[in-house]
Amino acid sequence: MIKTILKNSYIQKEITTHSATVIFSHGLGDSGAGWIEVMEEIQSRNNGHIRFICPNAPIQAVTLNGGFKMPSWYDIKSLSSRGDEDPAQVDESKNIIETIIKHEMEEEKIPAERIIIGGFSQGAALSLYTFYSQTETKLGGCIALSGYLPLATKFVANSLNKEQPLLMIHGDCDQVVRHQWGKLSFDHLKSQGINGEFITLKGLGHHSSPEEIDLMTKFISKTLPK
């Protein structure tokens, strides 16, 4: 399974000494290729010891887009509400991320606390769910860009990662994943005792920006120092 997952992932291999890993998941309809240049930019800022892995989501039907098949971590039925995600599909995609984590720990000998998971939009949602579902693996941290917590109405953070750092960034002009959804998800997690920061970027829509990349870089460099 891991060979197939890694074969279908974009991996930055030009590193000095591999002592840390960032696993970053793309949004709906995108691919890992859409983020590898951003990861290379972050790596170039004195983060040559970090390997960046950008996995590709499975191709599956998305109700929101009339059943059209596209890269998707799980089905999305509507943009009007949250919490109607398919638990089985969310868990299947969580298993993909967990398989990569296990590979980095066992084959690359990277300690769990030297691994950050993160993503954009649906990939951010998957990362939040995966991060706070861990009961045996204490990771380094989590990054969620323009994201939200899936299955939020049923989700309870029962995780070793409650004390680990979370960075959530959301634009206040996001018309796809509303800013309020991200903030509500953060508040829900915060009420359960997680250690995190929510940053609002003025004028930012449903995309990234140089300011956001700067914030990501600082978080990654601080969490995964040489």
Curated annotation (Swiss-Prot):
Q: Does the keyword Hydrolase apply?
A: yes
The EC number(s) attached to this protein equal 3.1.2.-, 3.1.2.22
Give, as one word, the top-level EC class: hydrolase
Q: Name one Pfam family in it.
A: Abhydrolase_2
State the reactions this protein catalyses. S-hexadecanoyl-L-cysteinyl-[protein] + H2O = L-cysteinyl-[protein] + hexadecanoate + H(+)
Q: Which residues are annotated as active site?
A: 121, 174, 206
**Which cysteine pairs are covalently linked by disulfides here?**
none
Identify the GO cellular component terms for this protein.
cytoplasm; nucleus
Q: Name one GO molecular function term.
A: carboxylic ester hydrolase activity
Compartments reported by the entry: Cytoplasm; Nucleus
Which one GO biological process term can you cite for this protein?
A: fatty acid metabolic process
The primary location reported for this protein is cytoplasm
Alphabetical UniProt keywords:
Cytoplasm, Fatty acid metabolism, Hydrolase, Lipid metabolism, Nucleus, Serine esterase
Keyword Glycosyltransferase on this protein?
no
Q: What does this protein do?
A: Hydrolyzes fatty acids from S-acylated cysteine residues in proteins with a strong preference for palmitoylated G-alpha proteins over other acyl substrates. Mediates the deacylation of G-alpha proteins such as GPA1 in vivo, but has weak or no activity toward palmitoylated Ras proteins. Has weak lysophospholipase activity in vitro; however such activity may not exist in vivo.
- To which protein family does this belong? Belongs to the AB hydrolase superfamily. AB hydrolase 2 family.
What's the protein here called?
Answer: Acyl-protein thioesterase 1 homolog 1
Q: What is the originating organism of this protein? A: Dictyostelium discoideum
Highest lineage ranks of the organism? Eukaryota, Amoebozoa, Evosea, Eumycetozoa, Dictyostelia
